[in-house]
């Protein structure tokens, strides 16, 4: 299957090695973001922190879902994840979402917003690269992009107090756009 699928994508003019690099870097970013959001969520304390903990949890679980949805496509195209977790983490297309030195709620929100803005850029690039050429990867990247834009809007609204128009939330980790790509659902 990977050889046939890969040839079909290559025939459209896509450099599959470049696409795999983009997808692996995106998967690494989602994986590391899940880890760092776990730490950030645990440091969202006090009354202000309790108010945003579930929102961080929602983004964290959806980012894990993004990782889980990207991995099958990587293998379908004949790629694979690195065997070494450290090597994999170093490939992430976005900076690590480290806990800030001063872990105030405002500083945590700034880290979260920066991470989501990077993710929006990553999936916009993948969508632009695959549009009209690789419908499966495009559909997947677009679904993830929808969720990353929502995450960005959530954190921007919480940080600035200005309405974002994107405060759709269901139960944490619901992934309304990406869930169709997850094999466990």
Curated annotation (Swiss-Prot):
Catalytic reaction annotation: 2 Fe(2+) + H2O2 + 2 H(+) = 2 Fe(3+) + 2 H2O
Compartments where found: Cytoplasm, Nucleoid
EC number: 1.16.-.-
Binding, Fe cation: 30, 66, 116, 148, 151
Record keywords, A-Z: Cytoplasm, DNA-binding, Iron, Iron storage, Metal-binding, Oxidoreductase
GO CC terms of this entry: cytosol; nucleoid
Gene Ontology biological-process annotations: intracellular iron ion homeostasis
Family stated for the protein in its record: Belongs to the Dps family.
Subunit annotation: Homododecamer. The 12 identical subunits form a holow sphere unto which the mineral iron core of up to 300 Fe(3+) can be deposited.
Protein name as it appears in the record: DNA protection during starvation protein
UniProt organism field: Pyrococcus furiosus (strain ATCC 43587 / DSM 3638 / JCM 8422 / Vc1)
Gene: dps
